[in-house]
From Swiss-Prot:
Function statement: Required for accurate and efficient protein synthesis under certain stress conditions. May act as a fidelity factor of the translation reaction, by catalyzing a one-codon backward translocation of tRNAs on improperly translocated ribosomes. Back-translocation proceeds from a post-translocation (POST) complex to a pre-translocation (PRE) complex, thus giving elongation factor G a second chance to translocate the tRNAs correctly. Binds to ribosomes in a GTP-dependent manner.
Compartments, record wording: Cell inner membrane
EC number: 3.6.5.n1
Protein name from the UniProt record: Elongation factor 4
Family listed: Belongs to the TRAFAC class translation factor GTPase superfamily. Classic translation factor GTPase family. LepA subfamily.
Domain tr-type G: 5-187
Pfam families xref list: EFG_C (PF00679), GTP_EFTU (PF00009), GTP_EFTU_D2 (PF03144), LepA_C (PF06421)
Species for this entry: Psychrobacter arcticus (strain DSM 17307 / VKM B-2377 / 273-4)
Keywords: Cell inner membrane, Cell membrane, GTP-binding, Hydrolase, Membrane, Nucleotide-binding, Protein biosynthesis
Record PROSITE patterns: G_TR_1, G_TR_2
Membrane topology: Peripheral membrane protein
NCBIfam families: lepA, small_GTP
Location, primary (coarse class): membrane
Record lineage: Bacteria, Pseudomonadati, Pseudomonadota, Gammaproteobacteria, Moraxellales
A molecular-function term among this protein's GO annotations: translation elongation factor activity
Name of encoding gene: lepA
Length: 598
């Protein structure tokens, strides 16, 4: 049992690639939690995809015992947070479990928007934030400039910020000493009624749901009966302990500590992230504030290439959902693609990761339609509906108002690229809200339609700023605008999976661009394939994939012209008959062409 005064709960806030997971590895090594032969890069990133992409998706925790030079032994509970904009709710839950945070900044690159957003979240939640300069052994570091940036942009004192190299371990021992001095000890009465926060939950095939919790007050012991506030269910604690990073069964968790609970919960919905746990004997304990149900921001249709894989696909999604409460799916049918699922995601990265995991871990071949956001539609009779699939829109003459979601985007960009970034935001129908100059960086705040942000805004932002701009966004409001649905017809048949919702002013351009892109992607058939873009019954763009044809006149050397005409008309009649019964094969790239229309 560790006294409250000797516990430190902290998190690391960092932008992608600023060295958060590497610094965690050094902490684990220095506190002797793993032997050298067990060490591997990114110890806490347990998924293969996390290691390959170098990103952290799920929150992880590790309890380390640190012997301070003053002779005291401290329990350090480090809670790892995701760094990507799609996973910001998981970050806020991880931070709610801490008293302090280390803001790790790359001493060469400087401050990025994602760190700023997460840092503001930490400050709002009352955490002490300590700046740390990482990668100090690189030749191109500019520590003085970066310290100035941290003070200008985030507003925390960084003059005495420890300078470390997580890769080589330089300065990490001094950082651990500073951390113990700087971050406050947790408070909480160990004899009060139990109140604990669920930081993260995941599913284990043998144990059921494993929940990572932070005990605010009270004590949890093995065999206790727990009560989960939002689901109102009671469960018996089967196993309880801490990660060192390997699970270590301690049989008890007390106020101020972070650890895991296994209580035989069969479904991840039974232990939602951010919820409050108490004892079944004291169900009236107050909830820890900040809990919210996660709502998907981006929707896309996913269909198995082989229709026989449908059940396998359903099982795969159910298994993924067990571990990822933010993934939403419902059955969907498409005239062009058959049976599949409409899936909801937190953002484009989340969607890519889910698709990659389905293909890699479950060996599925999938066709994914272009993603869309949720639109609010006011119908003529005054009723309001929410539509996430363009093919489910009501008829245009039945729509009174079309409202689209607007995202508040915070962009940090060096002054040299300010013009390019502002042009991009305005092209994407953005409205400037604020602009602040902070040292060599500029903070731009724009309101941009969510549909424009989720498409390829992030990639375009990186390319116009040579990778220096960074973005953080969140949903702001719904706003009325003139939007239309553009349908794609192939040989006169609507392909529901290719429909898109665009602004009226861009509809002709986007329709024509999509049609010409499709022409490149659909392979030539034995008959002409007409590709058309239409708004309602009005055709706004067309192109034709020309038929492959055999030279039927090859063996006519001279001779009567009527003989040639007869052969040509016979071929023409055959092609016409083919067109009536022929199916056009549409490759996966064509469905994603909607994304690439600039």
């Amino acid at each position: 049992m560790t006294a409250l005064a000797n516990i430190r709960n902290f998190s690391i806030i960092a932008h992608i690639d600023h060295g958060k997971s590497t610094l965690a590895d050094r902490f684990i090594q220095m506190c002797g939690a793993l032997q050298d032969r067990e060490m591997q890069a990114q110890v806490l990133d347990s998924m293969d995809i996390e290691r390959e992409r170098g990103i952290t998706i799920k929150a992880q925790s590790v309890t380390l015992y640190y012997d301070h030079p003053n002779g005291e032994r401290y329990q350090l509970n480090f809670i790892d947070t995701p760094g990507h904009v799609d996973f910001s709710y998981e970050v806020s839950r991880s931070l709610a479990a801490c008293e302090g945070a280390l803001l790790v900044v790359d001493a060469a690159q400087g401050v990025e928007a994602q760190s700023v957003a997460n840092c503001y979240t930490a400050v709002d939640q009352g955490l002490e934030v300590m700046a740390v300069l990482n990668k100090i052994d690189l030749p191109q570091v500019e520590p003085e400039r970066v310290i100035q940036e941290i003070e200008d942009i985030i507003g925390i004192d960084a003059v005495d910020a420890p300078r470390v190299s997580a890769k080589s371990g330089l300065g990490v021992d001094k950082l651990l000493e500073a951390l113990v001095e700087f971050i406050p000890a947790p408070t909480g009465d160990r004899d009060a009624p139990l109140q604990a926060l669920i930081i993260d939950s995941w599913f284990d095939n043998y144990l059921g749901v494993v929940s990572l919790v932070r005990v605010r007050q009270g004590t949890i012991k093995k065999g206790d009966k727990l009560y989960i506030k939002s689901t109102k269910d009671a469960h018996l604690v089967g196993s309880i302990g801490v990660f060192t990073p390997k699970p270590l069964d301690t049989g008890i968790l007390e106020a101020g500590e972070v650890g895991f609970i296994i209580a035989g919960i069969k479904d991840i919905a039974g232990a939602p992230v951010g919820d409050t746990i108490t004892h079944a004997s004291t169900p009236d304990v107050d909830c820890i504030p900040g809990f919210k149900q996660i709502t998907p921001q981006v929707y896309a249709g996913m269909f198995p290439v082989e229709s026989t894989d449908f059940e396998k696909f359903r099982e795969a999604l159910q298994k993924l959902q067990i571990n990822d409460a933010s993934l939403f799916f419902e059955p969907d049918t498409s005239d062009a693609l058959g049976f599949g699922f409409r899936c909801g995601f937190l953002g484009m990265l989340h969607m890519e990761i889910i698709q990659e995991r389905l293909e890699r871990e479950y060996d599925l071949d999938l066709i994914t339609t272009a993603p869309s956001v949720i639109y609010e539609i006011v119908k003529k009779d005054g009723s309001i509906i929410y539509v996430d699939n363009p093919s489910r829109l009501p008829e245009p003459n039945n729509i009174e108002e079309f409202r689209e979601p607007i995202a508040r985007c915070q962009i940090l960009v060096p002054q040299d690229y300010l013009g390019n970034v502002m042009t991009l935001c305005i092209e994407r129908r953005g409205v400037q809200v604020d602009m602040r100059f902070m040292g060599r960086q500029v903070q731009l705040i724009f309101d941009i339609p969510m549909g424009e942000v989720v498409m390829d805004f992030f990639d375009r932002l990186k390319s116009v700023s040579r990778g220096f701009a960074s973005l953080d966004y969140n949903f702001e409001r719904y706003q009325v605008d003139k939007l239309v649905k553009v349908d794609v017809l192939i040989n006169g048949d609507k392909v529901d999976a290719l429909a898109m919702i665009v602004h009226e002013t861009q509809s002709r351009y986007r329709g024509n661009a999509l049609v010409s892109k499709m022409k490149e992607l659909i392979p030539r058939q034995m008959f002409d394939v007409a590709i058309q873009a239409a708004i309602g019954s009005q055709i706004i763009g067309r192109s034709t994939v020309k038929a492959m044809r055999k030279d039927v006149l090859a063996k006519c050397y001279g001779g009567d012209v009527s003989r040639k005409k007869k052969l040509l008309s016979k071929q023409k009649a055959g092609k016409k008959r083919m067109k009536q019964v022929g199916n056009v094969e549409i490759p996966q790239e064509a469905f994603l062409a909607v994304l690439q229309v600039d």
